[in-house]
Amino acid sequence: MRTLVAVLAGALVSSAPPAPAVAKEKGADKVPAVLNFKMKGLDGKEVDLSRYQGKVVLIVNVASQCGYTPQYKGLQALHDKFAKDGLVILGVPSNDFGKQEPGSNEEIAAFCEKNYGVKFDMLSKVPVKGDDKVPLYEYLTSKETDPRFAGPIKWNFTKFLTVAC
């Protein structure tokens, strides 16, 4: 697991430090704050991020019509190589940057499968910046979470790496 974290940390352009642990509720197992969110998958079903507890989680906002879109290939390669060691990649489609993700969730899923064979987890398309950004991205970009990484993300394929133990 340490090798996995070192390889990923060195390979990523931007990453976040591990999130502090907080209790879900009194007496419950501790779950890192970054996993205290529920979102929807591309299929519309609820995804409770706490299911990734104990994993290395790489959260990436993605878009299918961006100059960085070929990063899907590298993300899939990381998934193929390290998923068995506890790596989870969460793709989070967003249309916030240059309207480069105009498709529906179904179109995004088809694009990712056809062009990159994406098998890692993909969440539904959501806002990741501005006043209407989803709570997960509110947390990831919050000054209270880590002042070094606070503020709006700059573009598609911004990465947050956390050890969710």
Predicted region positions:
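Positively charged n-region of N-terminal signal peptides that target proteins for export
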Residues: M1-T3
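N-terminal "domain-start" segment that seeds a small globular fold
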Residues: V22-S50, P135
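Conserved helix-turn-beta segment immediately C-terminal to the redox Cys motif
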Residues: K55-V56, S64-Q65, T69-P93, E113-Y116
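Thiol-based oxidoreductase modules, predominantly thioredoxin-like and allied folds used
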Residues: G86-G103, K119-G130
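Thiol/selenol-based redox catalytic cores and closely related redox-interacting motifs
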Residues: G117-C165
